[in-house]
Amino acid sequence: MKISIMWMTRKRSHELIYSLSSFIMRAKDNSNVEYIVISDPDDNETYEAIEKINRMCFVHDVEIKNLVSDKRYGYEELEKYQNIVGEVFTGDCLFIMNDDVVCLNDDWDEEIRNSLKPHVENARWIGLAGVNENWKGSTTFVGINRKWYEITNRVSGNRATDGYIMTLGKKLGIEPLRPKVEMVHLQRGRETVTFERNNKRYITGGLPDDGLGGYPTKSPKPPKYYHDPNEFTNDYTDFVEGKKRFDNDFQKLKEHYAE
């Protein structure tokens, strides 16, 4: 079973490499993991950093797909990057990752495979969270399996992908698969990050606030996050269109589960 995992980022190559490396070096079978990075056309920093990693080949059988979007969408249209990746990923599942996330446990990929294998014929979504998240019952980082993508024909219908997929699952009555993948979410703007693991308490440095709330947005500040699966913008037109996309995806998935 092949796992695809993607990162969207903008001119934060240091954080991206740190995040990517933590997953690459802790995977059990990198030959069955597809690493994907997508960046903007004017973001040479990110593109060149990934090209350099690919030339180094510091772990056998690793190649990172280095994608460039057709235009700069920014955080205002974050789902566009994800849906571009959706058209080309080759794995049996796709995870959306942040560049401020570090993987902590070895064989994380095998844990995901073991969780997903019994469900390949059904559309399922996967929920992960950082060990330091305040909302540990929630799913900060989400993934979908191939069947889910084939049914909806997209990764997300709006930029709040975690909320979008989570609420689809909740409305369908489908709980997320929760593989035991331990990650720390460094969360921009925090001086320190505290978390517990294996009965030990850790304190690590956070990441500096880049003035944009950590988001690759085109506007001075990111739009308000309403935690609503149908809306992540102040534009009413986009709200209406987002609602249509959500309802359409829900109906398709509902019919799948009725079969």
State each model region's role.
Residues 82-93:
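Active-site nucleotide-sugar/metal-binding loop of Leloir-type enzymes
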Residues 91-102:
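Short beta-strand-to-loop acidic/aromatic patch adjacent to the donor-nucleotide binding site
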Residues 106-128:
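Conserved donor-nucleotide/metal-binding helix-loop-beta segment in metal-dependent transferases, i.e.
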Residues 159, 163-259:
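C-terminal catalytic/acceptor-binding lobe
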